[in-house]
Amino acid sequence: INNWNVSRCSYMSYMFDGCCSFNQPLDKWDVRNVKTMGYMFTNCSKFNQPLNEWDVKKCENMELMFAECHNFNQPLNTWDVSNVETMEGMFFDNRSFNQNIS
């Protein structure tokens, strides 16, 4: 699915919610038009793929995006999150995440 053309998508909420075994690369995705990613990887307990190259500057909702992604520990320091309105619980119960997000 890394080669899917998602460039026209604006809503990716719940896309992989509950996919406990999912751990496939998505680094080639063009997400520049996505406005909401809330709950996108919630309960994806094995997911740990790089997403640092994603252009998320149009995203407004990242609520619970990585909640209960117990293995996710990838850098996100290049993300421009200046338009995000809610990050509530973005890393809730994510036991591995230990990246610099400043």
What are these regions (language model features)?
Residues I1-S102:
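Negatively charged
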